[in-house]
Amino acid sequence: MAAPKGSLWVRTQLGLPPLLLLTMALAGGSGTASAEAFDSVLGDTASCHRACQLTYPLHTYPKEEELYACQRGCRLFSICQFVDDGIDLNRTKLECESACTEAYSQSDEQYACHLGCQNQLPFAELRQEQLMSLMPKMHLLFPLTLVRSFWSDVMDSAQSFITSSWTFYLQADDGKIVIFQSKPEIQYAPHLEQEPTNLRESSLSKMSYLQMRNSQVHRNFLEDGESDGFLRCLSLNSGWILTTTLVLSVMVLLWICCATVATAVEQYVPSEKLSIYGDLEFMNEQKLNRYPASSLVVVRSKTEDHEEAGPLPTKVNLAHSEI
């Protein structure tokens, strides 16, 4: 069996550690054991090895060099794919074939190694497609469902602040309507034993009396339904009314804030820069016309250089003077 001569080239081109290349070189004697050793890191090459065994059976090819060269081509393709991170499989195949050319000098072994690179290519493509299918994908309706869940949480939290109550309407004997309002309370009654016959009869009589009373109250309530229909509607729909009011209030506040910011006067006043040509710039901005030289009158007085100023007035003592 010819030993591979391109270990230095493979280590230089692929950037592999020497320990990995040494393991790959020592694994040439046992194809199945080497495949199991590299499966955890470089991927599965068992399918490619089986294809090589079908291409180079031992009963047809008594020499094992071509079979081992084909299997080594499978491993070289996996190593190149691991180094290149599987970005371009065609480039990986070219690197694998170059490594086979450098590793083997005989044409039969080179062809077998190239065949191993070619056999590993479809399995690498299938594995890459499987990995891509396992990647999580976002559905098109996911943003809508997220907004809907957020809106439902906001509505639930808003309704939790609203206290519900029970309202009872009763009509007194004088025709006035009495309204009773209380918070809902849930009471769990214990298991009651079977009542005696006399207690059952008394309870039935009480129930019949309550039914008659409720029917009378209901009749009177229907008669006065037109007057208190609005109050009853408010009591039944108080939750939705308060929720709508809260949402509208928030929207109005946001609109007021945006309108105030948009229509506010700018408070920043740019500082004016001082310039020695300030008067000239002011005249240019105001578009003022200069006076012509002919309109200017220059008045000069004749003064002599030897002329001196006159004496100062004498001082007067105000204490000795009469005013």
Swiss-Prot record:
GO CC annotations on file: Golgi membrane; late endosome; late endosome membrane; lysosomal membrane; lysosome; plasma membrane
Keywords, ordered alphabetically: Autophagy, Cell membrane, Endosome, Glycoprotein, Golgi apparatus, Lysosome, Membrane, Phosphoprotein, Signal, Transmembrane, Transmembrane helix
UniProt signal peptide: 1-35
Matches recorded under Pfam families: BSMAP
UniProt PTM: N-glycosylated.
TM segment ranges: 239-259
Membrane topology: Single-pass type I membrane protein
UniProt-annotated glycosylation sites, renumbered to this chain: N90
Compartmental location: Late endosome membrane; Lysosome membrane; Cell membrane; Golgi apparatus membrane
Intervals, Extracellular compartment: 36-238
Motif (ATG16L1-binding motif): 263-281
Annotated family: Belongs to the TMEM59 family.
Note on domains (UniProt): The ATG16L1-binding motif mediates interaction with ATG16L1 and promotes autophagy.
Function: Acts as a regulator of autophagy in response to S.aureus infection by promoting activation of LC3 (MAP1LC3A, MAP1LC3B or MAP1LC3C). Acts by interacting with ATG16L1, leading to promote a functional complex between LC3 and ATG16L1 and promoting LC3 lipidation and subsequent activation of autophagy. Modulates the O-glycosylation and complex N-glycosylation steps occurring during the Golgi maturation of several proteins such as APP, BACE1, SEAP or PRNP. Inhibits APP transport to the cell surface and further shedding.
The name this protein goes by in its record: Transmembrane protein 59
Species per Swiss-Prot/TrEMBL record: Pongo abelii
